[in-house]
């Protein structure tokens, strides 16, 4: 398995930050939102961000902007699809069904949420699809915050989760912890009491 092509759905602060960190690692990224103009605006914000999200401004060429209607076919070629949509479960469930219909079988699907439990996110998925689905909770700003929480279930393909962990450590420079499926995960819970 290898991660060379990633689709990030949702180009807000977190989605664009994840896309930027992936392109810093020379990964080809497609950044999708409701309209291509929104994704293009996110690319512009990445270039203008302070502190900079890119290690070199030329890295922005690794990101293609698009929309979830016209460019959804990019999901078919993605090694990893990262969902960063609004925290509304019905929207997420509908999006996952669309992703799961077209994605290549060996791909990883993840959500960047820390507020909705993995069991709730995956409740409408088949047994097979649940094996490839997890939470990858990045912190903002993605380039500078070292922590990444990965939440998986017993049903997950352990080899894929371990591969994703190593990829995020080695290629994205993250300190990865595997968390239980609890509200707020670990980082947010510790932060509340710090």
Task: Locate each region found by the language model.
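Hydrophobic/aromatic residues located in beta-strands of well-ordered beta-sheets
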Residues: 29, 63, 81, 109-110, ...
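Internal alpha-helical scaffold of NAD(P)-dependent oxidoreductase catalytic cores
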Residues: 127-129, 147-182, 191-194
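Rossmann-fold dehydrogenase core element
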Residues: 106-111, 122-139, 174-175
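Structural motif
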Residues: 9, 17, 66, 84, ...
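Amphipathic alpha-helical segments at domain termini/boundaries
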Residues: 20-24, 58-80, 163-173, 178-184
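Rossmann-like dinucleotide-binding cores of NAD(P)H-dependent redox enzymes
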Residues: 31-57, 150-159, 176, 182-188
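Rossmann-like NAD(P)-binding element
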Residues: 34-41, 52-109, 115-120, 148
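NAD(P)+-binding Rossmann beta1-loop-alpha1 motif at the extreme N-terminus of oxidoreductases
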Residues: 1-49, 102
């Amino acid at each position: 398995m290898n991660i060379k092509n990633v689709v990030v759905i949702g180009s807000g602060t977190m989605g664009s930050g994840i896309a930027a960190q992936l392109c810093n690692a020379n990964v080809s990224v497609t950044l999708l939102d409701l309209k291509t103009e929104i994704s293009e605006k996110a690319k512009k914000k990445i270039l203008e961000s302070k502190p900079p999200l890119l290690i070199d401004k030329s890295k922005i060429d690794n990101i293609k902007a698009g929309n979830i209607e016209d460019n959804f076919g990019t999901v078919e070629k993605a090694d990893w699809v990262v969902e960063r949509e609004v925290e509304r479960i019905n929207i997420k469930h509908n999006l996952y069904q669309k992703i799961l219909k077209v994605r290549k079988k060996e791909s990883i699907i993840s959500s960047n949420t820390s507020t909705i439990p993995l069991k709730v996110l995956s409740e409408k998925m088949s047994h097979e699809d649940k094996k490839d689905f997890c939470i990858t909770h990045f912190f903002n700003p993605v380039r500078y915050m070292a922590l990444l929480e990965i939440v998986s279930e017993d049903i997950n393909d352990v080899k894929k989760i371990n591969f994703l962990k190593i990829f995020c450590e080695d290629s994205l420079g993250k300190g990865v912890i595997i968390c239980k499926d609890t509200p707020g995960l670990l980082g947010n819970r510790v932060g509340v009491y710090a």
